[in-house]
């Protein structure tokens, strides 16, 4: 009788151990899915001084990186910069998440890698993120209006470039895991879109542009702006 219970105990223990091992293995595979599905982009890591493994634990950096991968798919000659620190009049800095130098001009991106529902309008100081809490509950989180943030970026970038200022475009980019439920804009000066919409939006903007930057001009602007990625607050 004892032998029967012992064999049964060993069998149950073995099954539990096997299931636990598989669950752990599946979890590790899931954790590695994000990083393994991304092709490396040396410019991002070099400019931001971010290690590839850090992306898995930082949603903000994930959003910037994913945006960079999309921008790299744009046709034609271009340059991309990340985390530019531009000095303001009072000596403090304002940070641009990502910037694209394109034949049609300069695109300034404020990246928000959020989930849930997003509500906001151009003139509100704060926007709202609504997250599901399960069982019919929801939680609200306020965050500073990203359009106002980008207005500051545009102002001081224009000041920094001085006379050498092509068209400047303001883009607020939300991640693909959210829903832009109610976004009210007063004009078309700012675009509020998701990552999957970026290529189409820039292609349309480029078609309407009266500016054409040559590869030499793009390189000049890149050399002018690259040092700003080295500055820290």
Put a short name on every predicted segment.
Residues 1-94, 101-106, 112, 117-120, ...:
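Surface-exposed interaction regions that form or flank ligand-binding interfaces
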């Amino acid at each position: 009788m004892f032998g029967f219970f012992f064999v049964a105990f060993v069998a149950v223990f073995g099954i539990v151990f096997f299931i636990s091992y598989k669950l752990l293995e599946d979890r590790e595979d899931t954790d590695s899915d994000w990083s393994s599905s991304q092709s490396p982009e040396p410019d991002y890591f070099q400019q931001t001084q971010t290690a590839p493994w850090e992306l898995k634990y930082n949603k903000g950096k994930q959003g910037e990186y994913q945006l960079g991968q999309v921008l790299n798919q744009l046709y034609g000659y271009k340059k991309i910069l990340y985390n530019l620190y531009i000095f303001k009049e009072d000596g403090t800095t304002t940070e641009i998440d990502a910037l694209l130098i394109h034949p049609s001009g300069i695109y300034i991106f404020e990246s928000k890698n959020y989930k849930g529902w997003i509500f906001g309008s151009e003139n509100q100081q704060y926007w709202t993120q609504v997250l599901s809490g399960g069982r019919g509950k929801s939680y609200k989180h306020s965050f500073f209006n990203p359009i106002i943030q980008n207005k500051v970026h545009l102002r001081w970038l224009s000041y920094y470039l001085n006379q050498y200022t092509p068209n400047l475009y303001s883009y607020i980019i939300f991640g693909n895991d959210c829903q832009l439920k109610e976004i009210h804009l007063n004009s078309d000066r700012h675009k509020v879109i998701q990552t999957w919409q970026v290529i189409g939006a820039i292609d349309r903007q480029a078609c309407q542009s009266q500016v054409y930057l040559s590869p030499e001009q793009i390189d000049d602007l890149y050399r002018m702006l690259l040092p700003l990625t080295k500055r820290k607050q």
